[in-house]
Structure formats: structure tokens, C-alpha cells
């Protein structure tokens, strides 16, 4: 085992509630509420009912954990599976920039399901979630940009992040965490090819990551051993899944740098790679008083990661695929001033003006933007107007980034809108859930989070 893996597992084993700064605990609560809304917003939307039916067919008729979208009880495994699938559909879940990881969608489903199964408290859930974020983010940074080009990091690294969160609930020691990483890492999978075909694999990725991470933890607790150097070994994850791995990232400022607090919230209901350009275009249009009809063309200056992910989507075939179309997102921004769930579902595919605007949008690699990525996601657009002017828009921190974050009032508003979208809960129930999350540290059991 390398010194960096050992440092990480020792940190995870020793992490205690009292060591976590108050702002980090508060941000964990913020992220939890944000995740809860994302999961509930998917109720009734394809392909989530497929996962629900699978859980009903293969899982128990009852259990200690709760499936959020339908309120049914099940085992921790199947609750984690369905809740993680539903977390990653509406594209409103959080993102950590430099790891390009969506931690909430894998950490919270596994941690909540296991906490309900094990009878853990709100405080224990918070500590476990922090552990999952801190480990997952560092492993994502360790694997680097080359990993993300082919592999869906939230699927691969997410398996380990989920496993760590559950392992922390089970009070694993350093050796158990090492075995746990081995068993989670050997299951890590998830490829970007699905985007070309508008396939449903993205939800399968997160469902399996959360459930497989939980599986690894429960088996480790029962004595299953795992590879001791799964991250850096000769036939480990970096060897097979990365060309630019940096082992030092695994132990980067453990205990002083709280990576969870660097996590961004999503403001638009689309792939995060579209957000910088969307914000830059919106700012430019407001500043110059432009309408969509005033714009002849838009060139978005982006990083390579955006081209790798968004470049596969030319003419989107589904609402979900439209969330990965730069032109569609900017079309909604230009025409409606926002790219939320309502705009996507009502207009992304049906409004011909969106398609017309999409044809005006192109992406080009920008050295400044690419050099800053993934630590910073810069937004740069060049607009040619119908009357021949060339205008430039720029933002350095998209809405939702730590330096331009959402307040608790904005998070509550977002949560209510997400729940209202799917009608998964009434307004009163949504308010009660918000109150429960803000009292998370007081809860001795987590049955109320259902």
C-alpha cells in the first residue's frame, strides 16, 4: 500500500464529528437538501419506474430503508439503488469542479439507506457523508482528466465514495477501509458512450455505484478482503483507467482542506459543462439588451471536457439528451431567460425556435478556459448580432459555484420547485422535509427522511 492510500484510509478511520468545522457541517446539510430535491423531482419520469419495478421484483416486500420516489420500504441495497438512479436524472445534482464528480448522487443514497438500516443518527449520517465526499473527490482528482474523457467519473469513483460513506457508518478501522476500497474499486465501471445514443445508462451508473458501494461495505464488515493497492497498484484503477494519475492528490491536505465545501450547486437543469456559457450568454444579453432574434451566431469558448461530453450530442432525441446539447441550453436561455426543468420539458424539443437557435451555436477549444479546467469552469462566449456587431461575454464563476453559491433561501426555493415539478410531495410535506433537514443533527433516527 502506498503512503497516500494509507494516509487517506487513516484519515477516514479517524474522522470524528468534533473534527469537522461548523461551516462544513452546515454545507453538508445544504447539499443533502439539494440532493433530496433532485431525487424527488424524478418521480414518475423514465427510466426511474424501471428501477422501482426491479426493486419490487427482486427485493423484499418491506424493509428498514425507504425508496424516496414512491415512499415504499425496502432493503438498504434496493433503496440505495433506486434513490441513486432518481438522483441523477433531472440534472440538478451537485458537482465538484476539479474532480468532475457528482458526489451527492452516490454518497447520500448509500449513506441514508445504510443509516436507516443500521439505526444511525443524523450526526452519524453527516460524518459518513463528509467521509464519502472527501474520499471521492480526492480519488477523482487522483485519476485526472484522462479518466473522465472515457469513464463517467460519478459511476467509477462514485462506487468508492458510496462505499466509504457506508464504511464510516459501520465504524471501519484503517485496515477495513483499505479492504473496502479494494472491493469497491474492482467494481468501478461506467462509460460515456451512452450519450451518443440517448441511452438510459447514466441512471444505471449511479444506481450501481451507490448499491455496489453499499454491497462492498456490508461484505467487508463480514470479513471480505479486497486488494490492498487498488488505486495505485500495477493492475489497479490508475493503471487501467488513467494516463495522468497524481497519487499525491489522494492525501492532499487531509483534515485542513475540506473538499466538500468546494462543491457547486446546479442552477440550470442541464449538464454542468453548459453552465459557464449559459451564464455568460445570459449576462451579455441582459447587459446589451439583446433578444434571441438579435443574435446571428454564438461561439462558446470551452474546455476539452465540454467538447468530449457535449460534442457527441448534435440533434437531441430526448429531453435528457437535450440537457447535454450546448445549443439547446443556450436556446432556452436566449428565448426564456432560464433553462430549468419546466423549460426543458415544455420547450427543448417542441419549440422550433430552440432548434433554430441551436443551429447558431458552436463550440471551440479555448486555451485559457482549458488551462483553468477543471479547477475553474470559465464561461466565454462570442456573439455576432444580426446587425453585424461582435460582442463578448465572460463569467469566472457560474451561479452555484462556491464563490457564487446558492443561499439557504435559494436552496429552499429550488427544493420546492423540484418537488413541485414531479408532485412527489405536497407543499406542506416539502416544508416539513426542509425543516427536518435543518434539524438533521438533532435526529436520533432517520425514519422521518422518507
Predicted features along the sequence, with ranges:
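Hydrophobic alpha-helical hairpins/lids featuring a short glycine-rich hinge
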Residues: 83-141
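Alpha-helical scaffold elements that line and support the substrate/ligand-binding pocket
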Residues: 21, 32, 107-114, 156-169, ...
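Hydrophobic face of alpha-helices
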Residues: 25, 29, 33, 107, ...
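Short connector loops/turns at beta-strand edges and beta->alpha or beta->beta junctions
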Residues: 87, 106-108, 113, 135, ...
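Glycine-rich, mobile lid/loop segments that gate access to catalytic sites or pores
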Residues: 115-215, 222, 227-229, 233-234
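Terminal-appendage/accessory-domain detector
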Residues: 1-100, 196, 201-211, 218-450
Amino acid at each position: 500500500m502506498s503512503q497516500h492510500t494509507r494516509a487517506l484510509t487513516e484519515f477516514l478511520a479517524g474522522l470524528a464529528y468534533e473534527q469537522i468545522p461548523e461551516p462544513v457541517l452546515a454545507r453538508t446539510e445544504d447539499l443533502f437538501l439539494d440532493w433530496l430535491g433532485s431525487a424527488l423531482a424524478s418521480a414518475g419520469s423514465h427510466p426511474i419506474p424501471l428501477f422501482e419495478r426491479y426493486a419490487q421484483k427482486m427485493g423484499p416486500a418491506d424493509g428498514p430503508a425507504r425508496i424516496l420516489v414512491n415512499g415504499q420500504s425496502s432493503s438498504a441495497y434496493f433503496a440505495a439503488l433506486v434513490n441513486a438512479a432518481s438522483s441523477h436524472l433531472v440534472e440538478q445534482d451537485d458537482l465538484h469542479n476539479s474532480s468532475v464528480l457528482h458526489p451527492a448522487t452516490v454518497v447520500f443514497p448509500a449513506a441514508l439507506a445504510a443509516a436507516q438500516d443500521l439505526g444511525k443518527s443524523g450526526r452519524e449520517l453527516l460524518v459518513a457523508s463528509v467521509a464519502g465526499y472527501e474520499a471521492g473527490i480526492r480519488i477523482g482528482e487522483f485519476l485526472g482528466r484522462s479518466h473522465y474523457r472515457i469513464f463517467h467519473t460519478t459511476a467509477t469513483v462514485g462506487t468508492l465514495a458510496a462505499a466509504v460513506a457506508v464504511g464510516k457508518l459501520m465504524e471501519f478501522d484503517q485496515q477495513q477501509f483499505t479492504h473496502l476500497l479494494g472491493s469497491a474499486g474492482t467494481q468501478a465501471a461506467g462509460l460515456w458512450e451512452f450519450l451518443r445514443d440517448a441511452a438510459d445508462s447514466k441512471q444505471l451508473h449511479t444506481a450501481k455505484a451507490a448499491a455496489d458501494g453499499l454491497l462492498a461495505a456490508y461484505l467487508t464488515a463480514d470479513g471480505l478482503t479486497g486488494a490492498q493497492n487498488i488505486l495505485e497498484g500495477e493492475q489497479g484503477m490508475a493503471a487501467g483507467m488513467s494516463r495522468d494519475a497524481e497519487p499525491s492528490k489522494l492525501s492532499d491536505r487531509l483534515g485542513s482542506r475540506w473538499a466538500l465545501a468546494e462543491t457547486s450547486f446546479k442552477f440550470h437543469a442541464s449538464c454542468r459543462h453548459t453552465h459557464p456559457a449559459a451564464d455568460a450568454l445570459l449576462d451579455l444579453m441582459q447587459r446589451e439588451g439583446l433578444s434571441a432574434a438579435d443574435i446571428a451566431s454564438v461561439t462558446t469558448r470551452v474546455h476539452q471536457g465540454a467538447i468530449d461530453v457535449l460534442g457527441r450530442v448534435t440533434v437531441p432525441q430526448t429531453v435528457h439528451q437535450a440537457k447535454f446539447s450546448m445549443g439547446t441550453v443556450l436556446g432556452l436561455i436566449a428565448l426564456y431567460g432560464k433553462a430549468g426543468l419546466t423549460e426543458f420539458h415544455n420547450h427543448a424539443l417542441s419549440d422550433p425556435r430552440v432548434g433554430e437557435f441551436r443551429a447558431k451555436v458552436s463550440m471551440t477549444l479555448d486555451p485559457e478556459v482549458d488551462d483553468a479546467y477543471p479547477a475553474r469552469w470559465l464561461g466565454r462566449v462570442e456573439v455576432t448580432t444580426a446587425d453585424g456587431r461582435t460582442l463578448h461575454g465572460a463569467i469566472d464563476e457560474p451561479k452555484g459555484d462556491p464563490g457564487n453559491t446558492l443561499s439557504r433561501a435559494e436552496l429552499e426555493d429550488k427544493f420546492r420547485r423540484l418537488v413541485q415539478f414531479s408532485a412527489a410531495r405536497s407543499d406542506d410535506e416539502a416544508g416539513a422535509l426542509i425543516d427536518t433537514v435543518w434539524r438533521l443533527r438533532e435526529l436520533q433516527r432517520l425514519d422521518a427522511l422518507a
